[in-house]
UniProtKB/Swiss-Prot annotation:
It catalyses: urea + 2 H2O + H(+) = hydrogencarbonate + 2 NH4(+). InterPro entries: Urease_beta-like, Urease_betasu_sf, Urease_gamma-beta_su, Urease_gamma/gamma-beta_su, Urease_gamma_sf, Urease_subunit. Pathway: Nitrogen metabolism; urea degradation; CO(2) and NH(3) from urea (urease route): step 1/1. It is an enzyme of class 3 (hydrolase). GO terms for cellular component: urease complex. The keyword Cytoplasm applies. This is Urease subunit alpha.
Length: 234
């Protein structure tokens, strides 16, 4: 007997469904995989019998399990179950929405419950204002955690004040500078141990006082705007 990969998958699903059915009969609460397998195996078997339509099985699939049949939180995890079942007139997709009613369980796995109040970003961090102008002919976008000292060299501003700092904006957001545009931004200190690597390779070390001197020298050598570093540009 030779089986295609799809037939093997269906056979494994049938085994899993039968095992789940046996555990349910013993009063064992089903986990996510077992619940999906039980519903899927039942739908495939009924479709093969050919006595029920897709609509019938979509409705029937919602009656196989109750909240008490599954582990806490499982009902919230199964939003829908889709099964490609073989009917006498061909393969059809049977989609069962909300196959297990949540019942009285109010907590869902991974759910985040937020307070109904505003959140202060970067609370307690001192911010400095910096006027920045884009002298280039293309837009420049700077992300929230980019070391602002090392941004595009066509952005003109006091780079010394930006050393060891990033934009005071929400994580994952950015500020866009259009060509010729000048705007004021707020910067805060980069958190953590302040070891800054990568970006434009102007620091690549601890962002301390000695590192600042070296970074300013590198920035001047690489023409990152007008920089007064007190160093010789050789």
């Amino acid at each position: 007997m030779k089986l295609t990969p799809k037939e093997l998958d269906k056979l494994m699903l049938h085994y899993a469904g039968e095992l789940a059915k046996q555990r349910k009969a013993k009063g064992i609460k089903l986990n996510y995989t077992e619940a999906v397998a039980l519903i899927s195996a039942h739908v495939m078997e009924e479709a093969r019998a050919g006595k029920k339509s897709v609509a019938d099985l979509m409705q029937e699939g919602r009656t196989l399990l109750k909240a008490d049949d599954v582990m806490p939180g499982v009902a919230h995890m199964i939003h829908e179950v889709g099964i490609e079942a073989g009917f006498p007139d061909g393969t059809k997709l049977v989609t069962i929405h909300t196959p297990v009613e949540a019942g009285s369980d109010k907590l869902a796995p991974g759910e985040v419950i937020l307070k109904n109040e505003d959140i202060t970003l970067n609370a307690g961090k001192h911010a400095v204002q910096l006027k920045v102008k884009n002298k280039g002919d293309r837009p420049v976008q700077v992300g929230s955690h980019f070391h602002f000292f090392e941004v595009n060299k066509l952005l003109d501003f006091d780079r010394e004040k930006a050393y060891g700092k990033r934009l005071d904006i929400a994580s994952g957001t950015a500020v866009r500078f259009e060509p010729g545009e000048e705007k004021t931004v707020e910067l805060i200190d980069i958190g953590g141990n302040k070891r800054i690597y990568g970006f434009n390779a102007l620091v690549d070390r601890q962002a301390d006082h000695d590192g600042k001197k070296l970074a300013l020298k590198r920035a001047k050598e690489k023409h990152f705007g007008t920089i007064n570093c007190g160093c010789d540009n050789k």
